[in-house]
Structure formats: C-alpha cells, structure tokens
Amino acid sequence: MDGGGEHSEALKNYYLGKILGVGTFAKVIIAEHKHTRHKVAIKVLNRRQMRAPEMEEKAKREIKILRLFIDLIHPHIIRVYEVIVTPKDIFVVMEYCQNGDLLDYILEKRRLQEDEARRTFQQIISAVEYCHRNKVVHRDLKPENLLLDSKYNVKLADFGLSNVMHDGHFLKTSCGSLNYAAPEVISGKLYAGPEIDVWSCGVILYALLCGAVPFDDDNIPNLFKKIKGGTYILPIYLSDLVRDLISRMLIVDPMKRITIGEIRKHSWFQNRLPRYLAVPPPDMMQQAKMIDEDTLRDVVKLGYDKDHVCESLCNRLQNEETVAYYLLLDNRFRATSGYLGAHYQQPMESASPSTRSYLPGSNDSQGSGLRPYYRVERKWALGLQQSRAPPRAIMIEVLKALKELNVCWKKNGDCYNMKCRWCPGFPRVSDMLLDANHSFVDDCAIKDNGDANSRLPAVIKFEIQLYKTKDDKYLLDMQRVTGPQLLFLEFCAAFLTNLRVL
C-alpha cells in the first residue's frame, strides 16, 4: 500500500492493503491482523492536515466516543478494536464492512420493500437506543454513516459529531447534514440530544421506503422553511402503520415527537422483530467483565499469557492481547450468526404476558438463555414540583425564595435558567431587585478584607432550570455544580420551605 512504510511502526501488527476511501483529513485502508488473520478497516486521520482547532476537536471527540465503545459488544454499532495516537496521525482500527454504506444500497435498490426496510430500521433503532443508554447522542445520523456487513446488517459508524449527554444540560451546536437535521438544530435552539436522533431516524426511514428524503430543496432558505414547517408528502403506497410512525417521528415540536421507547412499542416496529433485538443488551459494566472461555483459549493458543489476557480484559486495557481477543470473539459470532441468528419475537399485542419482552439470562449475555419478565411502566418526574401556573409567575416565586435565602444569581441565557451561588451566613443585600440579575460575575458581592477567618468555608454553586413537560406543566429542577453535597441538600430543604412545597 502507498504510504505503508511511514505507518509501519504504529501498525506493526497489521498487513496493510488497499485504500478503501479518501476524505479531506482521513483515509480508510483495509488491513489484516497478523496474529488472527482477520480483516479490519483502519481509519487514518492526518493530524498535520487538521490545523483548524474545530477539526482537531472533532477528532478528539470521536476518539473519546469510540473508546467508550471499545470493549462493548453491540451487533449494530461498528466495532472498534484499538485507537493508536502518534504525533503525526491517529489510527482507528475497526470492523471491516465489505458492502459499503446504506446510501449506496438505497440508490442501487431505488427503494426498499416494507419488510426489508423494517429489518434495517429495527437494527438502526437498536444501535441508536444503545448509544442513548450510554449517554451518547450521535447527531449525524444519515445513510452514509450506516455501514453494511457481509450479510447486509447495519453497523452505525462515524461518531465524529457525537457528544456525551450530561443530566440537566442541553446541547446547542448545529451538527449533521441539513436534509437529516431536526428543526431545533437548524434553528440554533437548545436540545437535549435523543430527540434530534429520533428526527434523523424518521428521515432515514422515509428514505428507505421512498428512495428520497422528505425535505429537499436546492435553495437552502427554502429547505430550512420546509424542515421548520414539517412540510413533506407521504406516498400513497405506504401502509397506514408506517405512515403513522413516520408522521410521529417528524413532528416539529420535540416535546411532542415520539421517543425511542415509543418507537419500539409501535405496531409496525414490533412486526417480525428478531428476538435478539427484543432483548435489552447487557449492562455496560457487566458486559465489560464477561469473558468468553472459548475465545480466551484461542487467544492463549496464539502465544499470549492467559492471566495477562484476563487481567487486561477486566481492567479494560487496550493492548495486543485485548485486540486479538475481540477480533476472535467477533469473528466467532459472525461465523455462528451469534446475535443475528435469533428467531422472530412475537408482536406485543399478540404475545402472552410471559413472552412479551425479555432480559438476558444470568449465564448468557447473548440472549440464548432468556427469562421472561413483566415490563412495568413507570413515569419519573425529576425536579422539585410540577405546576400549571404561568412560567413567569413560577420564576417570580423562585426569585422571591432566592431573595429570602440571600442567594446571588444571574440569568443564563433566558430568564428560565439561572446560575446561582449561596454562601451560608452571607450578609443580606437589601436592594436586590426581582427583575434584574444579582450578578456575581466580578465577585463584587463577596469582598475579601484580608482576614482569613472572615472567609466562608463553603460556597454552593448551582443551576435552576424551568422545564415544560409533555402534559403542559412546568417542572423546576435544581442541579448542584460545586460545593458540599449535604450542605446543598440543606439549602434545597430551606428553598422548598420558602416555596411552601413542604
């Protein structure tokens, strides 16, 4: 391969083959692992060409996300075996998918029949759901980022625009391809994350069934207008069930948009659902600790020390032993159909209570040993209280309580998100106005007179956010940023008392 010599030291465990594709800052080459003789794809990112800070940040973010999945097994997320970073390049060694991407497949087939589209869509939703469960939102879902293996199973790839979700915080960056981007993304609004992936999945489902995207226009302002207005046409040949599902995924208001959990329960999705997709994947930490004995024996046969392999796997290390182990493990499952050899799951409406849904058996993480369980619907309401009062009236009461407790605050964007600071024993400020910021940007509210004994031992910084729920109520949430946990709980109790909740 051209340029193979310059990578020889970093990729000494691989025979390098031909170039599969070339991008602006990266190229993908096919390679063979020397010890296991299994094929891999290696993405080579040239760090010298990524001079723009945002491109370097994109690469770092992708590496961070990929390393989250490096020892996790999901049948429809591209497998990453190792990430090698050198001063000049970043090498991402990953699963090789020989049938290209979903876009080329759609263009070749023009459009898919409903059964084939459903099979593909079920796999996509399973992968996206797994990302969300591990606090990763993809943000760039499109057919080009969905690869196909030798049996045309979907593999979710390219996490370069992904981000890690944090409780109580929104994302704002406008990411992804315009045709697949949600209205709130192109409008520059705040979003939590999962809801924009749901929109993109709706566009992908439309493309699978229709051979075109629902929102398209050569004129960018017109395209934005169509997306923001949710203006599209559903062909008459689509069944009523899939028309219903698409229309619920492409709702402009993210609060009313269907969720991944609701998609899973939809009748169209449930039809001919493979059993391995009806089974929730193993917990991340439990899965990382599981060792396949047959694969372990094969790794030892290659000359690796058994104890060192086990120790590396348990500690989630990246080294020659773990790379060989996961390559052998994945190819074992492909050879035996592994996950993908399961039978169909009965639709929920026709299934008996004992077969409605499953959890992995305690001795089998791949779903062959299943035990039935009853899914109990639970509604969680995080935050202090729900109210139907106008949001402005709620915030006035909140500010009154903050004033009573002598909390410093400032608006964080709009008036429904406040950054706050509370110092126990801080002298009362009598001229605080309810409709203005009690700013602490320049720390003028707290003066240091040089006396160490006068400095307060603890300061609580927290955020207050008012949310609107699906049933048109308003939910007040508080999140500690810094400061002692118990002291924050004491403050919350005092705050609730002032709000007359307790």
UniProtKB/Swiss-Prot annotation:
Gene Ontology BP, a term: intracellular signal transduction
Could you say which EC number(s) this protein's record lists?
2.7.11.1
> Domain UBA, which positions?
290-330
Q: Which UniProt keywords apply?
A: ATP-binding, Carbohydrate metabolism, Kinase, Nucleotide-binding, Phosphoprotein, Serine/threonine-protein kinase, Transferase
Look up keyword Transferase and say if it applies: yes
The chain's coiled-coil residues are none
Name the domain of life this protein comes from.
Answer: Eukaryota
Q: Which GO terms describe its molecular function?
A: ATP binding; protein serine kinase activity; protein serine/threonine kinase activity
Q: What residues does ATP bind to?
A: L20, G21, V22, G23, T24, F25, A26, K27, V28, K43
Give all Phosphothreonine modified positions: T173
Query: What residues sit in the active site?
Result: D140 (proton acceptor)
Q: What class of enzyme is it?
A: transferase
- What reactions does this protein catalyze? L-seryl-[protein] + ATP = O-phospho-L-seryl-[protein] + ADP + H(+); L-threonyl-[protein] + ATP = O-phospho-L-threonyl-[protein] + ADP + H(+)
Query: What GO cellular component is one of the record's annotations?
Result: cytoplasm
Q: Which residues form the Protein kinase domain?
A: 14-269
PANTHER family in alphabetical order: MAP/MICROTUBULE AFFINITY-REGULATING KINASE, NON-SPECIFIC SERINE_THREONINE PROTEIN KINASE
Q: What does this protein do?
A: Essential for release from glucose repression.
**Family per similarity comment:** Belongs to the protein kinase superfamily. CAMK Ser/Thr protein kinase family. SNF1 subfamily.
| Record-given protein name | Carbon catabolite-derepressing protein kinase
Species assigned in the record: Secale cereale
User: Gene encoding it?
Assistant: RKIN1
